[in-house]
């Protein structure tokens, strides 16, 4: 826990000085109890920035090859949950479910990877699977400015303003009950994911993935 606190304070200080970090809506994150925080993903900065915006320790789901060697050891001690991207990683998702059921906070990026252009991408069904398995509330979060500061492929960080906005918890218990049954499971997962991405878009005042896709097709 001490390591996490030191890392949190360091990142918060650096982000405030370099990126003029602004955080709002932290009060929406429950102080205790299992919860899933779902955010958009457009930069390698998203993990540390989102983490230092929360007032409780959280475990972050991230791809397996993101860290190696000593860095991987450090991140595991900070709560990282490695996920294999080439296939559905039941082990990684089961670990996230276990931590939430144990009363922990877990962070997921529903898009499954960084957005190349900074715009929101359609969410994948994995987030829906976690919600259906745990019945936990979902706190949506929008990260603005991280793509401008460090987009995919960039060789250096640019000093751009960054903001993090957390929204009110989303409760999917009624939807899960309504769509109970094996035949509706995939549809349920995708619908949960879509609704979460829509709320993230609203927090950022940007187009939701479904709206953007329809606009591109016209």
Residue ranges and their predicted role:
Residues 2, 91-218:
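Non-catalytic C-terminal accessory region of glycerolipid acyltransferases
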Residues 12, 48, 128-129:
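Active-site phosphate/pyrophosphate- and oxyanion-stabilizing loops and adjacent acidic/basic residues
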Residues 14-17, 199:
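Transmembrane alpha-helical segments that form the membrane-embedded catalytic/substrate-channel core
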Residues 23, 28, 167-169:
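A short N-terminal beta-strand-loop micro-motif at the entrance of redox/enzyme domains
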Residues 16-24, 146-148:
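Short gly/ser/thr-rich secondary-structure transition/capping motifs
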Residues 23, 60, 80-82, 138, ...:
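Conserved beta-strand scaffold positions in the cores of enzyme catalytic domains, especially
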Residues 7-8, 16-17, 29-88, 95:
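Catalytic core of membrane glycerolipid acyltransferases/transacylases, capturing the structured
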């Amino acid at each position: 826990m001490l390591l996490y606190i030191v890392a949190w304070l360091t990142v918060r200080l650096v982000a405030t000085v370099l990126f003029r970090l602004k955080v709002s809506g932290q009060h929406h994150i429950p102080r205790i109890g299992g919860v899933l925080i779902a955010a958009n993903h457009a930069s390698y900065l998203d993990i540390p920035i989102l983490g230092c915006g929360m007032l409780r320790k959280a475990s972050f789901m991230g791809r397996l090859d993101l860290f190696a060697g000593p860095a991987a050891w450090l991140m595991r001690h900070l709560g990282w949950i490695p996920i294999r991207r080439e296939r559905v990683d039941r082990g990684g998702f089961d670990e996230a479910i276990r931590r939430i059921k144990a009363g922990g906070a877990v962070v997921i990026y529903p898009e499954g990877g960084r957005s190349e252009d900074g715009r929101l991408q359609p969410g994948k069904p994995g987030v829906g699977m976690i919600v259906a398995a745990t019945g936990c509330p979902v706190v949506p979060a929008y990260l603005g400015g991280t793509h401008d500061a460090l987009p995919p492929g960039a060789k250096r960080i640019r000093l751009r303003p960054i903001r993090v906005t957390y929204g009110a918890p989303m409760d999917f218990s009624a939807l899960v009950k309504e769509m109970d049954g094996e035949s509706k499971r995939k549809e349920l997962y995708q619908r949960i994911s879509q609704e979460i991405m829509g709320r993230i878009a609203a927090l950022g005042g940007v187009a939701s993935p479904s709206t953007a896709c329809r606009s591109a097709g016209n």
